[in-house]
Amino acid sequence: MSLNPRDVVIVDFGRTPMGRSKGGMHRNTRAEDMSAHLISKLLERNAKVDPAEVEDVIWGCVNQTLEQGWNIARMASLMTQIPHTSAGQTVSRLCGSSMSALHTAAQAIMTGNGDVFVVGGVEHMGHVSMMHGVDPNPHMSLYAAKASGMMGLTAEMLGKMHGITREQQDAFGVRSHQLAHKATVEGKFKDEIIPMQGYDENGFLKLFDYDETIRPETTLESLAALKPAFNPKGGTVTAGTSSQITDGASCMIVMSAQRAQDLGIQPMAVIRSMAVAGVDPAIMGYGPVPATQKALKRAGLGINDIDFFELNEAFAAQALPVLKDLKVLDKMNEKVNLHGGAIALGHPFGCSGARISGTLLNVMKQNGGTFGVSTMCIGLGQGISTVFERV
């Protein structure tokens, strides 16, 4: 494959183990420390990359307050081997924040505004709760349905519109845990998880190199016993078919193809296209459909050209309609989220975009895929997608 000098390549990817937000492994670790540890370790294992060459650290984070406030990208960067002469910015596109961080770096590289970037994101939902400090404008109800701000109800709406049953959602939830457990047992996450010290349930310090969020004992029967989480009367979305509230961070080293060649680095993949799109906030979970269609058009590809997909599992009731309208539902078991997704691993907001993209690249490497798409829905009605080609 021939690459153009300003093509954007992914050099490496790493993430923390995913921790439960309630009493989980990261309960005594701050978001900046988690981020700095990840950046440092990823740079250590890529010795050909000079930290002084990093143009910018672009970090996704949604709730930018408390320990995640005051530009956590810069806070974390200053705690690493990256010199203070490099810059740092924190970005938020809610659930799509760290994928937007990747897009921002890619756009800079494409336009000659830097060659080497560190991108990723973090969310410590145990320390900074989802609604901490949030004050929604009551006037918004003049422009969007009140329930649009309640993600679970938007998932209920989307599932109802597309005829998604409770049984289908439960099966999807079981699949996520089973595949994530299988990937763990088979060592499929070995290259992406950067081990971190944390505390076990007894309060003992230990080195975690696995996700504590996966529940391999999950069954259809256990999920069927759960009550609806958002709509008590007739709802179908439960805690077992929703993304978990977790703590975690993810990181990528991104550079121009020319700089990678100069350094003698073999990249993981090249970005072929990117896109964002908006939808009615009432069906926010549908955003990946127009975003992916737009990205595929920009890449000159069709849906059948894509070997593997990573779709953020915000809710089973949201993921299934997306797969249905992208015409890949019948190929789900061969192409989609082969290592499970956010139902099993969790959805630390600022972390997830880079997390699913990096997991996708490892799935492509392990299974010999050429093209892959990572995509996710975004609160208040957006979607974001990236098309990768394996190098």
UniProtKB/Swiss-Prot annotation:
It is found in: Cytoplasm. Its EC number is 2.3.1.16. GO terms for biological process: fatty acid beta-oxidation; phenylacetate catabolic process. The active site is at C95 (acyl-thioester intermediate), H347 (proton acceptor), C377 (proton acceptor). NCBIfam families: AcCoA-C-Actrans, fadA, PRK08947.1. The gene is fadA. It is an enzyme of class 2 (transferase). HAMAP family: FadA (MF_01620). Gene3D superfamilies: 3.40.47.10. GO terms for molecular function: acetyl-CoA C-acyltransferase activity. It comes from Pseudomonas fluorescens (strain ATCC BAA-477 / NRRL B-23932 / Pf-5). InterPro entries: FadA, Thiolase, Thiolase-like, Thiolase-like_sf_Thiolase, Thiolase_acyl_enz_int_AS, Thiolase_AS, Thiolase_C, Thiolase_CS. Heterotetramer of two alpha chains (FadB) and two beta chains (FadA). CDD domains: thiolase. Belongs to the thiolase-like superfamily. Thiolase family. This is 3-ketoacyl-CoA thiolase. Keywords: Acyltransferase, Cytoplasm, Fatty acid metabolism, Lipid degradation, Lipid metabolism, Transferase.
